[in-house]
């Protein structure tokens, strides 16, 4: 299936992204921008921002839509990773940093302690930086979630990814209701934290199902949602079922904000979980907690 014109992006210029890429290489840090082949890497790197991928790059799950490598081997966490991440945040002068991780189902706490260590190092090196975490479901271990939230992130993101009908195909190791419960627990237990989720379209869902998911997310007290076009990483991954028009993405945004009451819905073909994540600082000023 040929990509429509609105999904064509210019290849990033080496000189525009080189400084960020070189720094990440120097500090031996992974980014989801690189590991997941994000189409916005040129724009984000050129703006001096990145979404850090910790505890990776290998993931203990093999979701058929994802471009991150599968690795079921048990690996020790790198105790120097949080300090290196804090240094990168300081050297890049980031005002808002996003930290995500691969799934680490091999760890007793799912990697919660590493998230907290990263928060502590960023706050030590760059106290004015707001912090967003994009976390896995921790296999429903709510003690692990509580451990992460004890670090007091400004934003907690957990992606719902797709509509419930497609979970067996796209997220066979995840449970739709469990993801909703995680998001609701964040808002109920830590009401000052802004909650966020995201989903892809183009996997076989209908527009009506997308709206139903948005309604579910709002009922579970989610504040911010991202919606973007699924792009298959390769022939071994799930194929694209459809390309959603920019007009329909705008309709999702409009309904989500005006009818369902989200603080923000970022919905464009090239939107990804952390795309324009720094805008959350404006939302925090407009809707203080």
Swiss-Prot record:
Q: Known Pfam families for this protein?
A: Radical_SAM
Subcellular location field: Cytoplasm
Q: Where does [4Fe-4S] cluster 1 bind?
A: 33, 38, 44, 274
Q: Where does [4Fe-4S] cluster 2 bind?
A: 59, 63, 66
In the UniProt record, which is one GO cellular component term? Answer: cytoplasm
- Chief location of this protein within or outside the cell: cytoplasm
The record's annotation in Gene3D superfamilies points to: Aldolase class I
The pathway it acts in is:
Protein modification; protein lipoylation via endogenous pathway; protein N(6)-(lipoyl)lysine from octanoyl-[acyl-carrier-protein]: step 2/2
Q: Which residues form a coiled coil?
A: none
For this protein, what does the record note about how its cofactor is bound?
Answer: Binds 2 [4Fe-4S] clusters per subunit. One cluster is coordinated with 3 cysteines and an exchangeable S-adenosyl-L-methionine.
Q: What class of enzyme is it?
A: transferase
Q: Which UniProt keywords apply?
A: 4Fe-4S, Cytoplasm, Iron, Iron-sulfur, Metal-binding, S-adenosyl-L-methionine, Transferase
Q: Which InterPro entries match?
A: Aldolase_TIM, Elp3/MiaA/NifB-like_rSAM, Lipoyl_synth, rSAM
Q: Which GO terms describe its molecular function?
A: 4 iron, 4 sulfur cluster binding; lipoate synthase activity; metal ion binding
- Per the record, the domain of life is Bacteria
Q: Which residues form the Radical SAM core domain?
A: 45-263
Please list the cofactors this protein needs: [4Fe-4S] cluster
> Which HAMAP family is this protein grouped with?
Lipoyl_synth
Family to which this protein belongs? Belongs to the radical SAM superfamily. Lipoyl synthase family.
Instruction: Please name the PANTHER family in this protein's record.
Output: LIPOYL SYNTHASE, LIPOYL SYNTHASE, MITOCHONDRIAL
Stated name of the protein: Lipoyl synthase
Tell me what organism the protein belongs to: Synechococcus sp. (strain RCC307)
Q: Which gene encodes it?
A: lipA
